[in-house]
Amino acid sequence: MTTLFISDLHLDPSRPEITDLFLRFLREQAPTADALYILGDLFEAWIGDDTPSPAADAVADALKVLTDSGVPAYFIRGNRDFLLGEDYARRAGLRILPDPCVIELYGRPVLLQHGDLLCTDDIPYQQFRAQTRDPAFQAQFLSQPLAARIAFAQKARETSQARQSEMKQGDRATFENVTDVAPAEVDATFVRHGVDTMIHGHTHRPAIHALQAGGRACTRIVLGDWYEQGSVLRVDANGWTLDTLSRE
């Protein structure tokens, strides 16, 4: 049997073909898995469980079919869907995990996280993250009318896009470094959690990295995004494989 890991699908009404690909994945591949882990950014944006969305409803229904069949599905909130709450999770049969967390995977402790906590060189983002993860901020935001939340989310997205565009027009190497994980934080994270395997998403740079941390040989697996194709990590007792999924 195999455990499946995905992240950064960024499901959005503007890209229905990716939602269709995910629904097909849930129907055709996930039912034979031991478990499914979604490590954040399942959705492009999430401003509350009460937001009307036929696509999100279809995803919840498909996930519930999967979990009702006996395949557990776990979710770690990402930087795009950190407001996804227990109401939607119940509808989808998802079990929300803390970010980060350690699980036992075929006899091996493995650290899971979305991945944005590793990008410590992006100081403005880390400040924004700290603000928006504050329970008081979230309660106040979710208490606003839907129209106000939509306007806030649109403004935040425009600000983020403008900042990234400005950074790209500058030193490309600096942009790549700032938006990727910080090596020192990766090392510290391995040591802090006492593991030698880490799985995360967020950076959209799928790869399997071998490194040394705290005097131990470690493996950092980065999941891919679903903008052009699907990306899935398959793990079993013998190892792991990072695969792509065609939209065809």
Swiss-Prot record:
GO terms for molecular function: manganese ion binding; UDP-2,3-diacylglucosamine hydrolase activity. Its EC number is 3.6.1.54. It is a peripheral membrane protein. GO terms for cellular component: cytoplasm; extrinsic component of plasma membrane. Its cofactor is Mn(2+). Belongs to the LpxH family. This is UDP-2,3-diacylglucosamine hydrolase. It comes from Stenotrophomonas maltophilia (strain R551-3). The gene is lpxH.
